[in-house]
């Protein structure tokens, strides 16, 4: 966010993500981001509020943050040697107006050796990340390439968010 503006505050919403449903993983990311932004905007109506949510789409199956080591291993094994999509929903709320969009990036993973997977899930890195990996961390070793926004994979599509902010200025 600091790339977009130096003046921001992070506020966590109280949205129950389990109650949000959508017809596609991309729509889910957008719906979650919208719900989060709208919840915070209700508490801070005079402010410009941005909400984000990222999901990993592996052949139509949604991967959020892993619950435990077994869940992280399941996700990473599914991603190994495959191309998947990372969808980040972005919603802006300001002065009673709102707009939402979604950014999608294709990520190509090389096959991952089982010992590397097991070592990785013993670190703290995968547990607060959709899809159980941090592209800017050790998982960069498995990334054969991307198509789209790199920052989207980290959960904040900088260009798309900056566009929305300019539109609402």
Question: Predicted regions span which residues?
Answer:
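N-terminal G-site helix/loop of the GST-like fold
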Residues: 1-11, 168-169
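Short, glycine/acidic-enriched capping/hinge loops at junctions between secondary-structure elements
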Residues: 2, 21-22
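A short linear boundary/processing microfeature
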Residues: 7, 16-17, 82, 123
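Short, conserved active-site loops that position catalytic residues or coordinate cofactors/metal ions
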Residues: 10-15, 51-54
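A short small-residue
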Residues: 12-20, 140-142
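Anionic-ligand binding patches
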Residues: 23-169
């Amino acid at each position: 966010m600091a790339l977009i503006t130096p003046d921001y505050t992070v506020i966590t919403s109280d949205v129950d993500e389990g109650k949000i449903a959508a017809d596609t993983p991309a729509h889910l990311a957008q719906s979650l981001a919208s719900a989060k932004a709208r919840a915070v905007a209700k508490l801070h109506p005079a402010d410009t509020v941005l909400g984000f949510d990222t999901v990993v789409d592996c052949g139509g199956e949604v991967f959020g943050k892993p619950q435990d080591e077994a869940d992280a291993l399941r996700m990473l094994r599914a991603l190994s040697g495959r191309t998947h999509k990372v969808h980040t929903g972005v919603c802006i709320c300001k002065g009673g107006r709102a707009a939402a969009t979604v950014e999608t990036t294709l990520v190509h993973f090389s096959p991952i050796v089982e010992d590397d997977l097991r070592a990785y899930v013993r670190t703290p890195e995968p547990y607060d990340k959709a899809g159980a990996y941090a592209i800017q961390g050790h998982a960069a070793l498995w990334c054969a390439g991307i198509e789209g926004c790199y920052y989207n994979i980290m959960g904040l599509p900088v260009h798309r968010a900056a566009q929305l902010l300019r539109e609402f200025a």
